[in-house]
Amino acid sequence: MIRLGNQMCRQVAFNIQTVFRNPGTANNPRLITRKMTQQRPPVNWTTSIPNQAAKDKEKIAPLGWFLLLIPATTFGLGCWQVKRKIWKEQLIKDLNKQLSTAPVALPDDLTDLAQMEYRLVKIRGRFLHDKEMRLGPRSLIRPDGVETQGGLFSQRDSGNGYLIVTPFQLADRDDIVLVNRGWVSRKQVEPETRPLGQQQAEVELTAVVRKGEARPQFTPDHKGNVYLYRDLARMCAATGAAPVFLDAVYDPQTAAHAPIGGQTRVTLRNDHLSYLVTWFSLSAATSFLWYRQIVKRIPF
Protein backbone atom coordinates (compact mmCIF):
# COMPACT_ATOMS: atom_id res chain seq x y z
CA MET A 1 0.00 0.00 0.00
CA ILE A 2 2.87 2.40 0.77
CA ARG A 3 4.41 1.67 -2.62
CA LEU A 4 1.07 2.40 -4.32
CA GLY A 5 0.71 5.73 -2.50
CA ASN A 6 4.16 6.85 -3.61
CA GLN A 7 3.33 6.03 -7.22
CA MET A 8 0.10 8.08 -7.09
CA CYS A 9 1.84 11.06 -5.49
CA ARG A 10 4.48 11.10 -8.21
CA GLN A 11 1.76 10.93 -10.89
CA VAL A 12 -0.19 13.86 -9.36
CA ALA A 13 2.97 15.97 -9.16
CA PHE A 14 3.73 15.20 -12.78
CA ASN A 15 0.25 16.26 -13.90
CA ILE A 16 0.46 19.54 -11.95
CA GLN A 17 3.71 20.34 -13.69
CA THR A 18 2.07 19.53 -17.02
CA VAL A 19 -0.75 21.98 -16.32
CA PHE A 20 1.67 24.79 -15.52
CA ARG A 21 3.74 24.05 -18.59
CA ASN A 22 0.65 23.81 -20.84
CA PRO A 23 -1.93 26.29 -19.56
CA GLY A 24 -4.38 25.13 -22.22
CA THR A 25 -4.92 21.88 -20.50
CA ALA A 26 -6.23 23.53 -17.34
CA ASN A 27 -9.54 24.27 -19.07
CA ASN A 28 -9.78 20.67 -20.40
CA PRO A 29 -10.16 18.20 -17.50
CA ARG A 30 -10.74 15.31 -19.91
CA LEU A 31 -7.31 15.82 -21.41
CA ILE A 32 -5.73 15.73 -17.96
CA THR A 33 -7.63 12.58 -17.07
CA ARG A 34 -6.67 10.92 -20.36
CA LYS A 35 -3.02 11.71 -19.81
CA MET A 36 -3.14 10.43 -16.28
CA THR A 37 -4.68 7.21 -17.54
CA GLN A 38 -2.18 6.80 -20.36
CA GLN A 39 0.92 7.67 -18.37
CA ARG A 40 0.08 5.90 -15.11
CA PRO A 41 1.94 2.57 -14.87
CA PRO A 42 -0.04 -0.56 -14.05
CA VAL A 43 -0.78 -0.79 -10.38
CA ASN A 44 0.35 -3.89 -8.52
CA TRP A 45 -2.44 -4.56 -6.04
CA THR A 46 -0.62 -7.44 -4.34
CA THR A 47 0.59 -6.71 -0.88
CA SER A 48 4.03 -7.55 0.48
CA ILE A 49 2.67 -8.21 3.97
CA PRO A 50 2.59 -12.05 4.52
CA ASN A 51 -0.72 -13.72 5.17
CA GLN A 52 -0.02 -15.09 8.65
CA ALA A 53 -3.32 -16.93 8.84
CA ALA A 54 -2.56 -18.91 5.66
CA LYS A 55 0.90 -19.81 6.91
CA ASP A 56 -0.49 -21.00 10.23
CA LYS A 57 -2.96 -23.17 8.36
CA GLU A 58 -0.13 -24.84 6.39
CA LYS A 59 1.79 -25.77 9.54
CA ILE A 60 1.68 -29.41 10.70
CA ALA A 61 -0.03 -29.75 14.04
CA PRO A 62 1.64 -31.64 16.92
CA LEU A 63 -0.81 -34.49 16.39
CA GLY A 64 0.41 -34.81 12.81
CA TRP A 65 4.02 -35.15 13.94
CA PHE A 66 2.91 -37.71 16.51
CA LEU A 67 1.19 -39.80 13.83
CA LEU A 68 4.47 -39.85 11.91
CA LEU A 69 5.73 -42.23 14.59
CA ILE A 70 3.62 -45.03 13.06
CA PRO A 71 5.46 -45.29 9.70
CA ALA A 72 8.78 -44.54 11.39
CA THR A 73 8.30 -47.30 13.97
CA THR A 74 7.16 -49.90 11.43
CA PHE A 75 10.13 -49.04 9.22
CA GLY A 76 12.46 -49.55 12.17
CA LEU A 77 10.86 -52.92 12.92
CA GLY A 78 11.37 -53.93 9.30
CA CYS A 79 15.08 -53.08 9.51
CA TRP A 80 15.31 -55.07 12.74
CA GLN A 81 13.76 -58.11 11.04
CA VAL A 82 16.34 -57.83 8.25
CA LYS A 83 19.10 -58.11 10.84
CA ARG A 84 17.30 -61.01 12.54
CA LYS A 85 16.95 -62.84 9.22
CA ILE A 86 20.66 -62.50 8.47
CA TRP A 87 21.51 -63.70 11.98
CA LYS A 88 19.17 -66.73 11.79
CA GLU A 89 20.46 -67.80 8.36
CA GLN A 90 24.04 -67.61 9.61
CA LEU A 91 23.09 -69.62 12.71
CA ILE A 92 21.56 -72.35 10.54
CA LYS A 93 24.72 -72.46 8.43
CA ASP A 94 26.86 -72.79 11.56
CA LEU A 95 24.70 -75.61 12.91
CA ASN A 96 24.85 -77.46 9.60
CA LYS A 97 28.62 -77.05 9.65
CA GLN A 98 28.74 -78.72 13.07
CA LEU A 99 27.23 -81.85 11.54
CA SER A 100 30.38 -82.29 9.45
CA THR A 101 32.92 -81.72 12.24
CA ALA A 102 34.83 -84.51 13.96
CA PRO A 103 32.85 -86.22 16.75
CA VAL A 104 33.86 -85.73 20.38
CA ALA A 105 33.56 -87.99 23.39
CA LEU A 106 30.47 -87.84 25.53
CA PRO A 107 31.16 -85.41 28.42
CA ASP A 108 31.37 -86.77 31.95
CA ASP A 109 28.61 -84.42 33.03
CA LEU A 110 25.64 -85.16 30.77
CA THR A 111 24.07 -81.80 31.61
CA ASP A 112 26.76 -80.21 29.43
CA LEU A 113 24.97 -81.66 26.41
CA ALA A 114 22.31 -78.97 26.80
CA GLN A 115 24.82 -76.56 25.22
CA MET A 116 25.95 -79.01 22.52
CA GLU A 117 22.91 -79.44 20.30
CA TYR A 118 23.80 -80.62 16.77
CA ARG A 119 27.30 -81.61 17.91
CA LEU A 120 28.59 -85.04 16.93
CA VAL A 121 29.53 -87.38 19.78
CA LYS A 122 30.85 -90.94 19.96
CA ILE A 123 29.22 -93.47 22.29
CA ARG A 124 29.80 -97.13 23.05
CA GLY A 125 27.39 -99.59 24.64
CA ARG A 126 24.43 -101.81 23.80
CA PHE A 127 20.79 -101.28 22.89
CA LEU A 128 17.95 -102.27 25.20
CA HIS A 129 15.58 -103.46 22.48
CA ASP A 130 12.87 -104.57 24.91
CA LYS A 131 12.14 -100.88 25.65
CA GLU A 132 12.02 -99.74 22.03
CA MET A 133 9.75 -96.79 21.12
CA ARG A 134 8.40 -95.30 17.90
CA LEU A 135 8.37 -91.64 16.95
CA GLY A 136 6.15 -90.50 14.13
CA PRO A 137 4.83 -90.92 11.61
CA ARG A 138 7.75 -89.36 9.78
CA SER A 139 9.03 -89.10 6.22
CA LEU A 140 12.38 -90.59 5.31
CA ILE A 141 15.32 -88.21 5.00
CA ARG A 142 17.65 -89.72 2.42
CA PRO A 143 21.44 -89.61 2.87
CA ASP A 144 21.59 -86.65 0.46
CA GLY A 145 19.36 -84.67 2.83
CA VAL A 146 16.22 -84.80 0.67
CA GLU A 147 13.01 -85.64 2.49
CA THR A 148 10.83 -88.11 0.60
CA GLN A 149 7.25 -87.19 -0.15
CA GLY A 150 4.31 -89.15 -1.44
CA GLY A 151 0.62 -89.02 -2.13
CA LEU A 152 -2.28 -90.76 -0.49
CA PHE A 153 -2.21 -93.71 -2.89
CA SER A 154 1.56 -94.20 -3.00
CA GLN A 155 2.43 -94.85 0.63
CA ARG A 156 4.61 -97.79 -0.33
CA ASP A 157 7.14 -95.53 -2.03
CA SER A 158 6.38 -92.31 -0.16
CA GLY A 159 8.83 -92.87 2.69
CA ASN A 160 6.06 -92.78 5.28
CA GLY A 161 7.12 -94.60 8.44
CA TYR A 162 8.48 -94.19 11.97
CA LEU A 163 11.69 -93.38 13.79
CA ILE A 164 12.89 -96.13 16.13
CA VAL A 165 14.05 -94.74 19.50
CA THR A 166 15.86 -97.25 21.70
CA PRO A 167 17.44 -96.85 25.17
CA PHE A 168 21.22 -97.26 25.00
CA GLN A 169 23.24 -98.54 27.98
CA LEU A 170 26.62 -96.82 27.97
CA ALA A 171 29.59 -99.15 28.36
CA ASP A 172 31.82 -96.93 30.49
CA ARG A 173 29.17 -95.74 32.95
CA ASP A 174 25.80 -96.65 34.41
CA ASP A 175 23.87 -94.02 32.45
CA ILE A 176 21.24 -94.87 29.86
CA VAL A 177 20.57 -92.46 26.98
CA LEU A 178 17.96 -92.44 24.23
CA VAL A 179 19.16 -93.05 20.67
CA ASN A 180 17.10 -92.45 17.56
CA ARG A 181 18.43 -95.36 15.52
CA GLY A 182 16.72 -94.18 12.32
CA TRP A 183 13.73 -94.58 10.06
CA VAL A 184 11.79 -97.74 9.16
CA SER A 185 8.78 -98.14 6.90
CA ARG A 186 5.39 -99.05 8.27
CA LYS A 187 6.01 -102.66 7.26
CA GLN A 188 9.10 -102.88 9.49
CA VAL A 189 7.82 -101.15 12.62
CA GLU A 190 7.62 -104.43 14.52
CA PRO A 191 11.02 -105.73 15.72
CA GLU A 192 10.25 -109.23 14.40
CA THR A 193 10.26 -107.92 10.81
CA ARG A 194 13.89 -106.71 11.05
CA PRO A 195 15.86 -109.30 13.06
CA LEU A 196 19.18 -108.40 11.43
CA GLY A 197 18.89 -104.87 12.79
CA GLN A 198 18.34 -105.92 16.41
CA GLN A 199 21.97 -106.06 17.47
CA GLN A 200 22.53 -107.52 20.94
CA ALA A 201 26.29 -107.07 21.08
CA GLU A 202 28.14 -103.97 22.21
CA VAL A 203 28.45 -101.39 19.45
CA GLU A 204 30.14 -98.06 18.89
CA LEU A 205 28.35 -95.37 16.97
CA THR A 206 28.37 -91.67 16.17
CA ALA A 207 25.31 -89.61 16.97
CA VAL A 208 24.04 -86.04 16.93
CA VAL A 209 22.99 -84.33 20.16
CA ARG A 210 19.36 -83.24 20.11
CA LYS A 211 16.95 -81.58 22.51
CA GLY A 212 13.39 -82.41 23.38
CA GLU A 213 10.43 -80.81 21.62
CA ALA A 214 7.57 -78.78 22.99
CA ARG A 215 4.14 -80.19 22.35
CA PRO A 216 2.79 -78.75 19.08
CA GLN A 217 -0.60 -77.10 19.19
CA PHE A 218 -3.62 -79.38 18.69
CA THR A 219 -1.42 -82.49 18.96
CA PRO A 220 -3.21 -85.44 20.60
CA ASP A 221 -1.69 -87.49 23.39
CA HIS A 222 0.76 -90.32 22.81
CA LYS A 223 -0.53 -93.87 22.53
CA GLY A 224 1.48 -96.58 24.24
CA ASN A 225 5.05 -96.62 22.96
CA VAL A 226 4.17 -94.47 19.92
CA TYR A 227 5.18 -90.82 20.40
CA LEU A 228 4.11 -87.97 18.16
CA TYR A 229 7.01 -85.67 19.09
CA ARG A 230 10.22 -85.80 21.14
CA ASP A 231 8.60 -85.77 24.55
CA LEU A 232 11.89 -86.23 26.36
CA ALA A 233 10.49 -86.13 29.88
CA ARG A 234 7.89 -88.80 29.22
CA MET A 235 10.26 -91.02 27.22
CA CYS A 236 12.84 -90.93 30.00
CA ALA A 237 10.22 -91.65 32.65
CA ALA A 238 9.06 -94.73 30.71
CA THR A 239 12.55 -96.15 30.14
CA GLY A 240 14.58 -94.90 33.10
CA ALA A 241 16.98 -93.08 30.79
CA ALA A 242 18.82 -89.84 31.44
CA PRO A 243 17.39 -86.76 29.65
CA VAL A 244 19.70 -87.21 26.67
CA PHE A 245 18.47 -87.69 23.10
CA LEU A 246 20.85 -88.63 20.28
CA ASP A 247 20.27 -89.12 16.54
CA ALA A 248 22.40 -91.88 15.03
CA VAL A 249 24.18 -90.78 11.85
CA TYR A 250 23.77 -92.57 8.54
CA ASP A 251 25.76 -95.79 8.19
CA PRO A 252 26.08 -97.18 4.63
CA GLN A 253 26.72 -100.65 6.10
CA THR A 254 23.34 -100.81 7.81
CA ALA A 255 21.78 -104.28 7.72
CA ALA A 256 18.74 -104.99 5.56
CA HIS A 257 15.50 -103.59 6.97
CA ALA A 258 17.41 -102.06 9.90
CA PRO A 259 16.60 -98.45 10.87
CA ILE A 260 18.17 -95.95 8.48
CA GLY A 261 20.19 -93.36 10.39
CA GLY A 262 20.90 -89.78 9.45
CA GLN A 263 17.39 -88.53 10.19
CA THR A 264 18.61 -85.19 11.53
CA ARG A 265 17.39 -81.94 10.07
CA VAL A 266 18.43 -78.55 11.40
CA THR A 267 15.06 -77.09 12.28
CA LEU A 268 15.11 -73.49 13.43
CA ARG A 269 12.09 -71.33 12.94
CA ASN A 270 12.88 -68.69 10.35
CA ASP A 271 9.83 -66.52 9.64
CA HIS A 272 11.76 -63.25 9.46
CA LEU A 273 11.19 -62.80 5.72
CA SER A 274 7.41 -62.68 6.16
CA TYR A 275 7.81 -60.39 9.17
CA LEU A 276 10.01 -57.87 7.36
CA VAL A 277 7.67 -57.81 4.35
CA THR A 278 4.77 -57.11 6.71
CA TRP A 279 6.53 -54.28 8.57
CA PHE A 280 7.86 -52.58 5.43
CA SER A 281 4.43 -52.82 3.78
CA LEU A 282 2.80 -51.20 6.81
CA SER A 283 5.46 -48.49 6.81
CA ALA A 284 4.90 -47.70 3.12
CA ALA A 285 1.11 -47.64 3.49
CA THR A 286 1.07 -45.44 6.60
CA SER A 287 3.69 -43.10 5.10
CA PHE A 288 1.48 -42.55 2.06
CA LEU A 289 -1.58 -41.92 4.23
CA TRP A 290 0.34 -39.51 6.46
CA TYR A 291 1.62 -37.50 3.47
CA ARG A 292 -1.83 -37.44 1.87
CA GLN A 293 -3.75 -36.45 4.98
CA ILE A 294 -1.29 -34.36 6.99
CA VAL A 295 0.89 -32.69 4.36
CA LYS A 296 -1.39 -32.38 1.33
CA ARG A 297 -4.64 -32.37 3.37
CA ILE A 298 -6.45 -34.41 0.73
CA PRO A 299 -9.66 -35.88 2.18
CA PHE A 300 -10.71 -39.43 1.45
Curated annotation (Swiss-Prot):
It is a multi-pass membrane protein. Disruption phenotype: Lethal at larval stage. Larvae show reduced locomotor speed and response to light. Results in smaller muscle fibers with mitochondria defects. RNAi-mediated knockdown is lethal at larval stage. RNAi-mediated knockdown in the developing CNS, in the eye and antenna disk from early larval stages shows increased lifespan with reduction of COX activity, increased succinate dehydrogenase (SDH) activity, reduced locomotor speed and response to light. The chain crosses the membrane at residues 60-82, 271-291. GO terms for biological process: instar larval development; mitochondrial cytochrome c oxidase assembly; phototaxis; visual behavior. It is found in: Mitochondrion inner membrane. It holds the Pfam family SURF1. PROSITE patterns: SURF1. One of its GO terms (cellular component) is mitochondrion. The keyword Transmembrane helix applies. Keywords: Membrane, Mitochondrion, Mitochondrion inner membrane, Transmembrane, Transmembrane helix. Probably involved in the biogenesis of the COX complex. PANTHER family: SURFEIT LOCUS PROTEIN, SURFEIT LOCUS PROTEIN 1. Belongs to the SURF1 family. This is SURF1-like protein. The lineage of its organism: Eukaryota, Metazoa, Ecdysozoa, Arthropoda, Hexapoda.
